[in-house]
Regions:
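Polybasic, low-complexity association/targeting segments
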Residues: 1-8
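Broad gene-expression machinery/nucleic-acid interaction feature
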Residues: 37, 144, 182
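Core AdoMet radical
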Residues: 57-73, 77, 81-101, 112-128, ...
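Conserved C-terminal portion of the radical SAM core fold
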Residues: 167-220
Length: 220
């Protein structure tokens, strides 16, 4: 962790009460239609996992944001995206990290997004537990969880400092599917420590493996 952090430049100052970005894109839905989909990029405390390939740390704070700040950010962003049918809540880390998003804010956000057809959250496989299904039930809508797989290369994945294994990812996927929650995966086209040729080969292998364990959608 310390070596990775030593390579980083200083963080910009962020307003804890405002999302650092939001956007609307037309995306293919599970039902086959192309729908306006909003993404809220939430400002919150930095993810504790310090992954080698992550550049999202620069959009985070060093300390936990005040109670109510995350819900206020979501409210602000949604007001600017009135026509969306689906929403992604991306927080440069893990939605179920209590230091990033408090249980109180998560509950408030659940009440706020229940009217959307789909809500997508991002989370580390090792933070997948019963809270995810509980949050889905509170929101009362379809929830997808997006997790960073990156690669299944047996030597490269440990070097990314994600502090997870492919088995961890598979177990988290199985837990989510058992709770009727769909899973998305992020896969690197060329992970570090690979040649271009190896990168393409292992990206394809990783996508195929992800689908084989139940992932519905892969982003590369």
């Amino acid at each position: 962790n310390s070596w990775i952090r030593s390579l980083r430049s200083p963080k910009p100052d962020l307003d804890a009460w405002k999302p650092y970005a939001f956007e609307v894109e037309d995306e293919l839905s599970r039902g086959g239609s192309v729908d306006p989909t909003g993404t809220v990029f939430i400002t919150n405390r930095e993810c504790p996992f310090t992954c080698l390939v992550c550049d999202l740390w620069q959009y985070t704070t060093d300390e936990s944001v005040p109670l109510g700040a995350v819900d206020a950010q979501v409210e602000t962003a949604l007001a600017m995206m009135p026509d969306i049918r689906h929403v992604k809540l991306y927080n440069a880390g893990n939605f179920f990290d209590d230091r990033a998003i408090t249980p109180e804010d998560r509950a408030a956000v659940a009440a706020r997004v229940g009217g959307f057809e789909t809500v997508v959250l991002e989370n580390h496989p090792n933070l997948v537990d019963d809270r995810v299904a509980g949050w889905r039930d509170t929101a009362g809508t379809n929830v997808d969880v997006a997790m960073g797989l990156e690669t299944i290369h047996p030597d490269v994945l440990p070097r990314l400092n994600k502090r997870m294994t492919a088995d961890d990812f598979e177990a988290a996927t199985a837990k989510l599917l058992a709770d009727d929650i769909s899973v998305r995966a992020f896969v690197l086209v060329r992970a570090p420590f690979m040649t271009d040729e190896e990168g393409v080969e292992w990206a394809c292998r990783s996508v195929e493996w992800a689908f084989s364990v139940g992932v519905e959608c892969c982003s590369v």
